Amino acid sequence: MNILEICQEVADITSTQRPTDLFNGKLQHDSIFLSVAKAELSSLMRYGDWQDLTKEATLLTVKNKTVYPIDNIVPDFYSILNNTVYIKDDMEKVIGAITPEDWMREKYFSCPDANIKFKIQGNAIKFLEAPEGGKRIVFQYRSNAVCYDGTTFEEKPTITKNTDIPIFDKYVVQLGITWRWLKRNGMDYTEEYNEYEEELRKKFGTGLATKDINLAVGEIDLADSGVIIDVKTGK
């Protein structure tokens, strides 16, 4: 179901006129639907680490280089998933993004160790010390995509066509557009908002429960992964 069809269903639910072209720009009615649809998709993208938005990227280090613009690595980057950064084909783990306080402490007061530390600043990955050249550092990140083109299936950071299809659960998107439309038009939206929040938590929680367990590394702390296996029973 594309974004226009979802908005038309919302119009039916709220007993209002159906939008015919979200991008016409001439009808205020259609423009309001476009505005709330964009707000809803943007809000969902920022809500959390959706499994549908989780991707893997590889950074190839260059000798003596400490700063790597993220756009050069992954143009659709929104945020890095902490504790998912590894040196490929190596047992060494790169410590996750550190706080400004940790950065200064490590830079000026700590003794060097085997870990590679970095921070995210100015839309770039900045290493505390330049890693060796030629290291392949892989990490998972959250994409900024909210929809994909209904024809080419290209992922996009915003809707630009009536036929664009939201990445997120269509029912959640419908509920979100519904309460936002009611609010925008000065109507009571309490019931719709509560239903939306309940469904959103349910869908997001389902994604968390089905996250992959990485079996490629030498050691796995299953307690940290949120999954505990009894060694004796295997359960």
Locate the predicted segments by residue.
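Glycine-enriched, solvent-exposed interface loops adjoining structured elements
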Residues: M1-K235
